[in-house]
Amino acid sequence: MLKITVVTPNGTLYDGEVDYVVIDGNAGQMGILENHVPVIVPVKEGFLKLVKGETEVFYYLSGAILEDKLNVVTVIAQEASNGNTI
């Protein structure tokens, strides 16, 4: 299980646990699973997908960076919105 926090200048959008995360990085789509090697990657403008069991939550990100270290994922974005409503 991963602990993930998604934050913007306006506050925290998501803080919880997920099975895995999918982002659009500069090198293409990237999945983060439990025990992934630590990374810091810029995130392309697009969707962040959070999956827990059968539930999928999407956020649309702009100007974001992701850090994964020891199963703790932090996404810091200049702008983000609920992607399930776009």
Where are these regions (language model features)?
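Compact, glycine-rich, soluble single-domain proteins
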Residues: 2-86
